[in-house]
Amino acid sequence: MIFQTTSEDLRTRARTGILNLNGVKLETPVFMPVGTRGVVKTISADDLEELEYSLILGNTYHLYLRPGTAVLERFGGLKKFSTWKRALLTDSGGYQVFSLNSLFKYEQDGVRFQSHIDGSRHYFTPNSVIDIQRTIGSDIMMVLDDCAPFDSSQERLRQSLDRTHRWAEMSVEYWEKNKNSSHLFGIFQGGIDLGLRLESLQKIVSLPFDGIAIGGLSVGEPRKDFIRILEGVSAYTDRSRPLYLMGVGTVPDILDGVKNGVDMFDCVLPTRNARNGQVFTSLGKINLRNEKWKSSDVPIDPHCGCKVCKRYSIGYIRHLHHVGELTAFSLSTYHNLYFMKNFLSEIRKSIQAGEFLKIYAKWKNLYEKPEFSG
């Protein structure tokens, strides 16, 4: 058992827990920064350790293509290659099948694709992506799945479920024959069709995965459908295992995920938005490129304790963004990841204190507005 619930909210499905990944213990709900190619863009492993992150995400598809499994094997895995000393989760490449669909072709037992880099041809199967993730050295491996677009026809959604379930069974069979210290998570699909979602959840929960993931949400569907599916599946999840909502990381989405029992989140938005000049604060979102911050001598967030806010003014960081200095990206990214760390900590404390809905309302009010106006 890698997961233990430590407290539960009495009015929602929100809970706190401990996730134990080969000796690295994490408090949940937890947010994972995304290091697609083996690094969280613009910041170092030292920064992540200073920020006290213990779990990051890497991408199997991209790491398989570059630097490639031969290099990773030579170094003893991504963690030794990058000197990352804590835990690592890798996705399987299933989402890249969805997002780069024109370059891929599904087959019965896998997916053929062309590299987006040089056009070379490759083939992923449920077994091969487990082997690749083992070479990467993942603490949590995700199974290969078929993520259909949310607006797919019933026929396409049915294909997605059948393929996802077949590949999940193949993954479990292969994994159990060749177990190591890695943990395997299953993924359920179904688009925005609640009936298919529940069918897929039932199937994936029936298999001996270490954790369960919600795939194919927050991929462009209307927000009301995102909420409807979260609420619809919440009562049927297996509370003995961690629940991971893949690719989700906005403040409102995390709040609704936690409310419905989600334990784990990842998303590129805190880091991508930082590079585009949007930062998260205790007062709401701020666009650093806005002219009104040009002469401001206050920090990004007067209530933030990160080293960026302790040292630099918002006017200075705006200037760096305005002239295209790379330091703007690293400073803004550091701040946003500090914010996310503290935000999840506040959520955990509110659940433990029986005040989650109070925190839920506070942050929803702040982050459903377009931008803090100053």
From Swiss-Prot:
As given in the record, the signal peptide range reads none
Which reaction equation describes what this protein catalyses?
7-aminomethyl-7-carbaguanine + guanosine(34) in tRNA = 7-aminomethyl-7-carbaguanosine(34) in tRNA + guanine
- For binding Zn(2+), which residues are annotated in this chain's numbering? C304, C306, C309, H335
- Required co-factor? Zn(2+)
Q: Does the keyword Zinc apply?
A: yes
Question: What are this entry's molecular-function GO terms?
Answer: metal ion binding; tRNA-guanosine(34) queuine transglycosylase activity
Q: Which GO terms describe its cellular component?
A: cytosol
The protein's UniProt keywords, in alphabetical order, are: Glycosyltransferase, Metal-binding, Queuosine biosynthesis, Transferase, tRNA processing, Zinc
Give the main EC class. transferase
Sites where the protein binds substrate: D91, S92, G93, G94, Y95, D145, Q189, G216
EC id: 2.4.2.29
Active site residues according to the UniProt entry: D91, D266
Residues covered by region (RNA binding): 247-253, 271-275
Q: Mind telling me which InterPro entries this protein's record contains? A: TGT (IPR004803), TGT-like_sf (IPR036511), tRNA_ribo_trans-like (IPR002616)
Pathway involvement of the protein, from the record: tRNA modification; tRNA-queuosine biosynthesis
Entry note: cofactor: Binds 1 zinc ion per subunit.
Does Metal-binding appear among the keywords? yes
The processes (GO biological process) annotated in the record are:
queuosine biosynthetic process; tRNA-guanine transglycosylation
Q: Name one Pfam family in it.
A: TGT
Q: What does this protein do?
A: Catalyzes the base-exchange of a guanine (G) residue with the queuine precursor 7-aminomethyl-7-deazaguanine (PreQ1) at position 34 (anticodon wobble position) in tRNAs with GU(N) anticodons (tRNA-Asp, -Asn, -His and -Tyr). Catalysis occurs through a double-displacement mechanism. The nucleophile active site attacks the C1' of nucleotide 34 to detach the guanine base from the RNA, forming a covalent enzyme-RNA intermediate. The proton acceptor active site deprotonates the incoming PreQ1, allowing a nucleophilic attack on the C1' of the ribose to form the product.
Q: Which NCBIfam families match?
A: Q_tRNA_tgt, tgt_general
Please report which protein family the annotation says this sequence is part of. Belongs to the queuine tRNA-ribosyltransferase family.
Quote the subunit structure annotation: Homodimer. Within each dimer, one monomer is responsible for RNA recognition and catalysis, while the other monomer binds to the replacement base PreQ1.
Q: What is this protein called?
A: Queuine tRNA-ribosyltransferase
Lineage, highest ranks first: Bacteria, Pseudomonadati, Spirochaetota, Spirochaetia, Leptospirales
